[in-house]
Amino acid sequence: NHPSTIWTRSSSQHYDWLFRLFRMLSAEYSMRYSNGVFKVHKSWEKLGKLLETVPKNIEDNGWEDPPQCMPDYCKDNDVVTAYRNYYIKEKSYFAKWKFINQPDWYNEGLKNANIRL
């Protein structure tokens, strides 16, 4: 019963948004790692069709932003800003961008937080 799973099943809009994110992350994986031979991530291969339809027991209860599951000092009124803060302040030791450049928001955030990798 993690806050994110509670959020996901609290509205069909949340479930659908998360499924679309899953689809986009799978496409990102294929773009980055195919390298001449098209690759599909195993999770998409096994679960894509299965999870595509919102379960019947999840009603449309409108939209709320996803929960901010992070230390309070990373949180922000804007959920995207909060998760960016979290990656900069807590996850920079492992965050990697293979085959693409790091996003500008990440580089700027590291500089502002005075974090050197």
Language-model segment annotations:
Residues N1, T5-L117:
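Sequence termini and other peripheral, non-core segments
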